[in-house]
């Protein structure tokens, strides 16, 4: 879980309070931010597949509508009642995203394995709107690239990229793009334009040199092979 995507909950909380919005449920890795929103009456039920902090642990103990669920109930693609398929929107992080909106949270930009992807691909596929949040450039490395090192979540399930330098919306959402351009002052770019902005800071990144030996596979939620993960060349 990316720190930015987790922290966004606090901004969502304030918007919900200002606009009088109430949510039927929130799910995923539960944090203290979501617990606060639940206890304030902003979220009716928390469906918890993983506690991310001690505030969430304490909430499970005392709040009857903070409900522990299994990974099957959370995101099994063969379970018609999976919570991931009932999401209106999801906010996710990324180590890389490319111009086809493919997302990588499996490996770093150097090809080293970061860890498991959790419900990243599941929630992106199930939600009506999948939003990726990330710094465009971090420590002279761009999160936006021509092609991700490893595909974790396919781009056809991703809708929006939000960065500190601007927002890119998948071109299939023409109505959303037009609405935001007409009614807001948000910086809306094509994803190719955002990539050019990133490269103006970082230059053209060097390609990762991979060895021939496959050490792991990135699989989609249905078991489809998305990408081989190769040993980093020495």
Task: Show the residue positions of the predicted features.
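Conserved phosphate- and dinucleotide-binding cores of soluble alpha/beta proteins
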Residues: 7-16, 20, 33-234
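Glycine-rich beta-strand-to-loop/alpha-helix junction loops that act as flexible
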Residues: 1-9, 28
